[in-house]
Structures are given as structure tokens and as C-alpha cells.
Amino acid sequence: MQGGNQPVDKSGQTIERMFSAVAPRYDLLNRLLSANLDQRWRRKAADALTLANGAPVLDVCAGTGDQALALRKRTPRVLAADFSVPMLRIAHRKFSRILAPKPAGFASDTLQLPLPSKSLGAITVSFGLRNVADLDAALREMHRVLKSDGETAILEFALPRSDLLRKPYLFYFRNILPRIGGWLSPRGSAYTYLPDSVMQFPQREEFTRRMEDVGFRDAHWHDLTGGIVCLYTGRRDS
């Protein structure tokens, strides 16, 4: 994978502090920097799941709860986990505005989920796996809590494969996005970190191979919006 110049710091304390600092402006920046496409991508992830067994569904790295809300439109039993308490507070405010049953949010590190093995029907993560300190450990933990034949849907930023899109995308990612983030966020460094973390993240075939290595089957990837985002899906073995 084409990387940034230096490995990004993904220690739990660094990531937690960064996202807690940007929490008040996080939704505004998501809408602005994605041209409001982030909500559409989250719906795509929710719609990629069959949710056939009626078991609870968990969104990890849940942030301010938008993916959990997209899931709630598909199924009543939704959980949302994130280790940033300021992010979760915003998520809880959103959950309080919808009819019961509401998503249940709780503080947790994706690497150590406080859930029994084989307890979930599905698990999702949107734009969060590139922030974990140990990607393979996170995938193993996601696999652990899924029931047999349970599903996963993972959204992550990607580099467009087309040169026509890649060059303007990289210019925006490296030059414009960090400036906008710096103007609007008290922690502008989060938006310098973003392009570096994307460029160092395994993509497409490499990522689905990592999914298969921890036990997922039927691992597939699907480009969204010209390949700037990738949707990955898979299942736990029966």
C-alpha cells in the first residue's frame, strides 16, 4: 500500500485524545469534507447485511452514532461501542431522539469487547479500523463475538484506482482537507493524520486477505463513489 512518509501514531491514548478533542465538530466536518456522502455510505453498509437471524448487531468505533442509527432503521437490536466518552455522549443524545428500542451505547476498546463469544448476528465498523493499534487483533475480536454465519460490513477510505481520480483526490486529501479541518476543529492535527492513516491502510485484495486470515469467509470488497471508499463484507464460518 502506498504509505505516508512516517508511520502514524495509533496508540490508544493518542487516538482517544484526538477523537475526544474533535468530537464537538466531528459531525459538521464529516458532512462538509465528504460533501454529505458519509451518510449515504453508512446506509450502504447497513443495507449490505441480511440481518436474518434477529441477533443483536454491534457497531464498533461507533463515534457519534451515525452508523448505529443507520443500522437501527434495519433492525431493533443495535449496540454501539467506542472508547471516546465525548463521542459517545453525542451518540447518546442522538439515540434519545428516536423511538424505542434505542441503540445502546457503551465505552469499549475494539480490541477487548466486553461481550461473550458468538453473541452477535452482525458487526460493523465505519472509518474506524485504520485507527486501531493492531488491525489483525481487531479483526479477530470482531470475528470472536459473531455467531456462526454472522456478518460483518466494514467501511474504510481508499485510494481510487483510476489515475484520473487519484491525482485530484490526493491533492484534496493532502492539501485542502487538512486546512479545512484545521480551521474548523480545535485539533487540526486529526485531519493531517487522516490522509496518512488512509495511505498506510491495506486496501481491497490485501484487506480481504487479512479478513480471511483471521477466519472470515466470503470476504469481498466493493468500491463506492469512484473508489474513494471501499465497503468490505464477510461472514464467520458456520
Annotate each language-model stretch with its function.
Residues 25, 35-55:
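Conserved alpha-helix/loop element of class I SAM-dependent methyltransferases that forms part
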Residues 121-135, 158:
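A short SAM/SAH-binding and catalytic strip from SAM-dependent methyltransferases
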Residues 1-25, 173, 184:
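N-terminal, positively charged/glycine-rich alpha-helical extensions of SAM-dependent methyltransferases
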Residues 136-151:
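A short glycine-rich, Lys/Arg-flanked "PGG" loop and its adjoining helix->strand segment in the class I
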Residues 111-122:
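A short acidic, Gly/Pro-enriched loop at the edge of an enzyme's catalytic core
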Residues 56-112:
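Class I SAM-dependent methyltransferase SAM/SAH-binding core
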Residues 13, 158-210, 220:
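C-terminal alpha-helical "lid/dimerization" subdomain adjacent to the S-adenosyl-L-methionine
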Residues 208, 214-238:
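Core SAM-dependent methyltransferase catalytic element
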